[in-house]
From Swiss-Prot:
The keyword Glycoprotein applies. Transmembrane segments: none annotated. Keywords: Cuticle, Glycoprotein, Pyrrolidone carboxylic acid. GO terms for cellular component: chitin-based extracellular matrix. This is Endocuticle structural glycoprotein SgAbd-1. Component of the abdominal endocuticle. Residues 1-66 are annotated as: Disordered. It comes from Schistocerca gregaria (Desert locust).
């Protein structure tokens, strides 16, 4: 027979007897023998000559204080400019009260017949939460966005055998062979 789940099981009463508190207070029994009192603490030694005063320590002054965010999380822009020329060139920059800054210049550039693109270069800078100054300089053009900064991680050097293989491939480009899959 399969047991049936009962959501409201019935239990037999349990006889629990709780002792009633005594009307007379219980006092701890005195110790069987008294231990001797502890010896008095040693007296401090007072030097006969006054101690020399410690040398003053130089005050630590931070090189630059980093302002904290305002209560609403916004910073005041202390410098901002934007210039747009008729030839398509431009420049913009800004700086905020907490030290964030950015500057970019750009111009139209022919990247293909009847097709122009923008070539830009600039930087942005800020202070990381740990106090490290961060500055990224960049170029953005037909070769993509290329950023540089001292804080970027550096990968391991390319092994010499791979460098030789890359140099050989660059010196000996293969002519593209048309295959049936490449015909459109």
């Amino acid at each position: 027979q399969v047991p049936v789940f009962d959501p409201f099981p019935k239990y037999n009463p349990i006889d629990v007897r709780i002792p009633r508190p005594s009307a007379t207070p219980v006092r701890p029994s005195p110790p069987a023998s008294r231990a001797p009192p502890p010896p008095p603490p040693p007296r401090p030694v007072v030097p006969s000559q006054p101690l020399p005063a410690p040398a003053p320590q130089p005050a630590i002054v931070p090189a630059r204080t980093i302002p904290q965010a305002s209560s609403d999380g916004h910073w005041i822009i202390i410098k901002q400019a934007k210039d747009q020329a008729n030839d398509g060139s431009y420049r913009w920059n800004y700086e905020t009260e907490n030290g964030i800054a950015a500057d970019e210049t750009g111009a139209l550039k022919a990247i293909a017949p009847n097709e122009d693109g923008t070539a830009a270069q600039g930087f942005y800078s800020y202070t990381a939460p740990d106090g490290t100054p961060i500055r990224v300089t960049y170029t953005a053009d037909e070769n993509g966005f290329q950023a540089q900064g001292d804080h970027f991680p550096v990968g391991p050097p390319i092994p010499e055998a791979i460098q030789r293989a890359l140099a050989w491939n660059a010196a000996h480009p293969e002519e593209e062979v048309e295959t049936p899959a490449r015909r459109a």
